[in-house]
Amino acid sequence: MTGANKEQSGQIKILLVDDEEGYVNVLAKRMAKRQVEVMIALSGAEAIQTLRKNDFDVAVVDLKMEDMDGIEVLKIFKKMDPELPVVMLTGHGSEKAARDGLALGAFDYLTKPCDLEELLATIIKAAEQRSE
């Protein structure tokens, strides 16, 4: 979605990638109330297919997933859409991997469970960067 489309719709469109279905459903419902349109992918493979078919302002990707880790997803996303800001989510103890993600082009990382306001602020900042 281009910056102009985002301005017309008033929403930020994100791809939320995490294999914890309950967690992402709660986040998606809470973000929808804040003018954030969320598409959910419950695996890395599903995320790649979803990105092929849709445009997003930001991707939010968990580092630890069953089928492929968030670093692999980040690398593929950056090949598919080099300008897509990717925010990594990490559990305690995997911050080194998140920093590795930053070195590979991730926009930022947050530790789970993350505060919704902090996540939204990071998403908005990332979307603004994309629309510049």
Role assignments for model-derived ranges:
Residues 1-13, 121-132:
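Non-catalytic signal-transmission and effector/linker regions of two-component phosphorelay proteins
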Residues 25-33:
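Charged docking surfaces used in two-component/phosphorelay signaling
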Residues 49, 71-83:
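Short amphipathic alpha-helix used as the core "switch/output" element in two-component signaling
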Residues 65:
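Receiver (REC) domain active-site loop signature in two-component systems and cognate sites
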Residues 43-46, 69-72, 93:
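Acidic catalytic/metal-coordinating carboxylates
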Residues 96, 114-124:
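C-terminal output helix
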